[in-house]
Amino acid sequence: MIRKLKNKHSNQGLTMIEVIAVLVIVGILAVVAAVKMSNTSDYDLASQLEVVKGHLRLAQAKALSSGSSWGINFTTSTTYYMFQETAPTTPVLILGEDNATVDLVTKKSALTITSAPQTITFDAYGSPGTTTLTVATNGGNITVTKNTGFIP
């Protein structure tokens, strides 16, 4: 008869080394996450840059749908507004904004338009013209492609 040897030691727990290793790994991950979350200025610049791109695309869409020119006028490094061809000095309220003139300081954004003053106008076909336009900011450049009006 062959008897099975029973293991008298139970494997139902964790060793102290395993517990310490898990705690060290969790601690390292917590520190990395805290460092990433503490500096949100890069995320602010990137998100506000996308908002400005969205406003440019809105002006382009309005030009396409209305059959008349629309544009964005970057008046200072922190303010801009959308306008229609018939009244280029009269700001038009941008969808989702509280005021017709967008003020980046009021929005508590660190984004600044370094190429201001600058005006970008889209014709009835959504084209900015025959020249590629660049809106320079401290968060990166916004390129409006000639003829097509593509904004990457």
Write out the residue ranges for each language-model feature.
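Type IV pilin-like appendage domain
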Residues: 70-124, 141
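Structural motif detector for alpha-helix initiation sites
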Residues: 16-19, 146
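Residue-level detector of conserved, well-ordered beta-strand and adjacent loop positions
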Residues: 38, 123, 145
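Aliphatic-rich helix starts adjacent to a transmembrane/signal segment
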Residues: 17, 23-61, 65
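Alpha-helix exit/C-cap motif
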Residues: 54-81, 149
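Low-complexity, S/T/G/P-rich flexible repeat/linker segments used as non-globular hinges
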Residues: 127-152
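N-terminal leader/signal peptides at the extreme start of proteins
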Residues: 1-14
